[in-house]
Amino acid sequence: MNRLRLVAIATFLIAYLSGCKSGYDGQLVGAADRPQWDNNLLPYGMVYVPSGTFTTGPSDQDINYSFNAKAKAISINGFYMDETEVTNNEYRQFVYWVKDSIAHMMIGGDHLLEGEDGTQSINWEMPIDWSANSEDAGALESMYYSEADRLYGVKDVDPRKLEYEFSWFLWRDAALRENFNKPRSTFIKKKKVAIYPDTLCWIRDFTYSYNEPMTRSYFSHPAYDDYPVVGVTWDQANAFCGWRTRLWNDNRSKNGEAPVDEFRLPIEHEWEYAARGGRIASPYPWGGPYLRNTKGCLLANFKPGRGNYPEDGGFYTVKSTAYWPNDYGLYNMAGNVAEWTLTAFFENSYSFVHDKNPDIRYDAKDEDPTTLKRKVIRGGSWKDVGYFLQTSTRSWEYQDSTKSYVGFRCVLPFLGRSMSDFN
């Protein structure tokens, strides 16, 4: 028996050593066993925006005389971008995931898996029974509104309980020479965010205006599933991006595939570059200079005249695929909802940002002045006049504000030089 064991071990060692020899043969050939990488990667619902250069800044008259977007030639690295704004139903997937993950943790038992290092993870194979008479009902009771807070006696989940914690790394702080020997944990930031959209923003945004049906139905009713999500803060949009990264990379890891970079909000100039669709000095995503086509039809969802909202076909928001896309295949880069960007708003930022992937950010703290909490929004919305639809127009909102006219879309950095290298 021992002899057979020795023969087996010797055979294994010979095969292993011969494999090493045939794999490298004393030559520099690169490390083996690298993860798989799909050269033709194209995330679902996104379009590829190639690297390029363009002149940012006004393509038409600066009617506000704000002078906060002077002309500047810049270069942008390639990236993927959502072809539409994130819709109610897409954001609802995030809400449901958070709700289910909290429920799994509260139920415990077979709903949790324990790793070799003692850490716990969720067993997503276990179903959750939300019925009132289920075995799980007692453990889940604290997720619901109290009886005094229930409307018509309906037992609804309290959206204030739906919190998601995400983290990010402060790369620029870590790059400072004086921080070279500091522990990695110094640069890891975490934030817990209540992720349910603020449905009351429809009432808050417009005084002496009847918008209660939108508050009751816009996010919850299937009629609006394909409409852009609104009422989300800048932090909520970032939390969504962090969850989306985790969701896809976890799946890729299970399949032995290399991870992708992080989904995130677009940098202001990435957004403008994509909105122009490769056109030069075009004031609108479709070119311009007019807001109507040759038949007199409006080309976006906005406020075309005083007291006139529905002429373009939409009283409020419209479906995320309404109107024609631009030359990159991106829908509603003008109108419908304005969109959050990653960029901090400073009036003079065009004067000092780099000409290669220009970027300026500021991680505002609660105690900071409100002016430091401004984030750039782009594209204009259903309630804005035509000026705000221009590809070069800059505007802003406070990062903790929720508006019925502000949504977002995600981008994903392209890894490599060009998509054409892989064809």
Regions found by a protein language model. Give the residues of each.
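Mature N-terminal segment immediately following signal peptide/propeptide cleavage
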Residues: 42-58
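Solvent-exposed, polar/charged alpha-helical surfaces in well-ordered, non-transmembrane soluble domains
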Residues: 89-96, 230, 235-242, 272
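Short loop/turn microsegments at loop-to-beta-strand junctions
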Residues: 44, 82, 261-262, 325-328
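Surface-exposed recognition segments
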Residues: 21-36, 42, 67-74, 94-197, ...
